[in-house]
């Protein structure tokens, strides 16, 4: 059993390396098998039915915020002062890894050219994070911690407040030249966000 888990992890590590260097289109099952030092590419299919499934699993294991929202039930009743910084840290810490930065840049370019890549990434990452935030906001409204509002918009608004910080790591370093640290940014944005949604007396 341990050997099976090790082999699976070996494949995921190799796939992450290949996807971050070559993107989804450039990485092949054969090249991933070679990087993983497998005797045959067909061994990958023992663990993953196709390249898309392997890519989804790489995203699952390499994006911290997805691990955070994997078990949403444990978070829904916690106060927003605690949960929103957790989500923000998970999102922003993704881009501290140079390989993850490369993969994100490649995925953005590929998603613009290939709708199927946009769909995979959208369903695996964006839809799940926004879906969690929407459910969380709705629960906080029920608990009286946030005023009634359209949780679809607040979920998008919260993530939107983090995009410049992520963009400074990925594409525009100039944003970070005189900018706050991640902790300073998430503290300020969470405060602004929650002040705007606090219950009205």
Question: Which residues does each predicted region cover?
Answer:
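Hydrophobic/aromatic-rich alpha-helical bundle segments in the mid-to-C-terminal region
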Residues: 119, 137-191, 200-201
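Helix-turn-helix
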Residues: 10, 18-53, 57
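Amphipathic alpha-helical packing segments from all-alpha helical-bundle domains
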Residues: 82, 93, 97, 101-102, ...
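Generic hydrophobic, amphipathic alpha-helix propensity
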Residues: 7-16, 32, 58-62, 66, ...
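A short secondary-structure junction motif
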Residues: 61-69, 98, 114, 136, ...
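Hydrophobic/aromatic residues within well-ordered alpha-helical segments
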Residues: 51, 58, 62, 87, ...
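Amphipathic alpha-helical linker/stalk segments
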Residues: 56-87
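N-terminal intrinsically disordered/low-complexity leader segments
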Residues: 1-6, 201
């Amino acid at each position: 059993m341990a050997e099976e888990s090790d082999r699976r992890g070996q494949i995921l590590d190799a796939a992450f390396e290949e996807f971050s260097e070559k993107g989804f289109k450039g990485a092949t099952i054969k090249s991933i098998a070679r990087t993983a030092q497998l005797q045959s590419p067909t061994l990958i299919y023992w663990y993953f039915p196709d390249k898309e499934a392997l890519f989804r699993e790489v995203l699952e294991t390499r994006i911290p915020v997805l691990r955070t929202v994997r078990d949403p039930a444990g978070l829904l009743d916690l106060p927003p002062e605690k949960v929103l910084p957790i989500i923000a840290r998970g999102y922003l810490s993704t881009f501290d890894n140079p390989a993850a930065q490369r993969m994100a840049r490649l995925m953005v370019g590929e998603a613009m050219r290939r709708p199927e890549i946009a769909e995979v990434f959208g369903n695996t990452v964006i839809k799940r994070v926004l879906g969690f935030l929407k459910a969380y906001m709705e629960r906080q409204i029920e608990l009286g911690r946030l005023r009634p509002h359209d949780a679809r918009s607040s979920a998008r608004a919260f993530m939107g407040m983090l995009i410049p910080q992520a963009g400074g790591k990925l594409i525009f370093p100039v944003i970070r030249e005189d900018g706050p640290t991640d902790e300073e940014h998430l503290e300020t944005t969470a405060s602004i966000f929650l002040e705007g949604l606090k219950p009205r007396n």
